[in-house]
């Protein structure tokens, strides 16, 4: 049996020796790691200095329960101004009839949407996790918390897309209340218009989780689900949308009251006012620079995919041009699987993640067939197609062990040191920097 009391005594003694400088030292180590690495995690990005200024403001100490003009706390007149700006910017950017900017994460936004659109016991249809779906769309996460029955779309792994004809057959039989589109692994536009038609035939809603492609939608480089028939669009604001880690919900005006009540008092109380202000600044940056940024993101992803393919890798989506987003997916089974390849690349200074692919079972989560690559962060620091080809060459050398780890790390560091300034922003500040505020 584990000695709980002994463990507590050990950690208590360690805690006595801790001080804030220990934390700062760890953060500095992490910052250096990111500065010297090539970050290709598809769900991360960098915020500008203007956005980060908001994080350390007094807003981070405050609460503002309720809606604009209808708060349960006093002292919120400036908060109301900020939230009003956030709502109007969101509506403008996404051409939305209604927007709620209070969700503090993508999963929270999805949970709110489930509360707004479904009842306990309803059936929903989503993309399975191996085919790219997010865990919050499934029984193990938000959908399960709402008490929903989850069925999965028939999926064409060669096209990396929902099979619409087969979906119609399943939908006529199962009668889902809600169709969810949008993915964690997403390479191409999804059939929103076609699913809208099916939904209308059986009286269902359509929801699109745009977390990964929100910035591409804002930059007009990807489909706008709201314009193609989605009732609700959720999305986290820190992936291709280069803002703080929080989320938005955009919807048809007829659903405004349902959405707002599902958010508060449903799943959000305080909504982190400092990052809300940061979102406003990021949205302004997106209006100013988003189109150029989004187009370059897609160009970079295509360039990386094409170079990896030319080096002999099994890049998914070949028949459709590999990708239309920030992501590239590669089948690396012949090189030991996603676990081995992700670790080898991390040792070389390239940071990405292993990923299930459509033919994998959930039992393969520990060592799936693939890796997922995202270029949105390296694009924000100014990298373009030439650098994508260089990254592919380094990846190839690491995976096939053509060079030593030290040689590879030096190549990564030499490439990265030319890119340490945030672009597509009002202030071109240092990208990887832990400020001393004393």
UniProtKB/Swiss-Prot annotation:
Q: What Gene3D superfamilies does the database record attribute to this sequence? A: Aspartate Aminotransferase, domain 1, Type I PLP-dependent aspartate aminotransferase-like (Major domain)
N6-(pyridoxal phosphate)lysine is found on 239
Q: Which GO terms describe its molecular function?
A: glycine hydroxymethyltransferase activity; pyridoxal phosphate binding
Give the superkingdom in one word. Archaea
Any one cellular-component term (Gene Ontology): cytoplasm
| Keywords per UniProt | Amino-acid biosynthesis, Cytoplasm, One-carbon metabolism, Pyridoxal phosphate, Transferase
The record's listing under InterPro entries reads: PyrdxlP-dep_Trfase, PyrdxlP-dep_Trfase_major, PyrdxlP-dep_Trfase_small, Ser_HO-MeTrfase, Ser_HO-MeTrfase-like, Ser_HO-MeTrfase_PLP_BS, SHMT-like_dom
Q: Which residues form a coiled coil?
A: none
Q: In which pathway does it act?
A: Amino-acid biosynthesis; glycine biosynthesis; glycine from L-serine: step 1/1
Binding of (6S)-5,6,7,8-tetrahydrofolate: at which residues?
Answer: 133-135
Q: What is this protein called?
A: Serine hydroxymethyltransferase
- What is the species listed in this Swiss-Prot or TrEMBL entry? Archaeoglobus fulgidus (strain ATCC 49558 / DSM 4304 / JCM 9628 / NBRC 100126 / VC-16)
The UniProt gene name for this protein comes to glyA
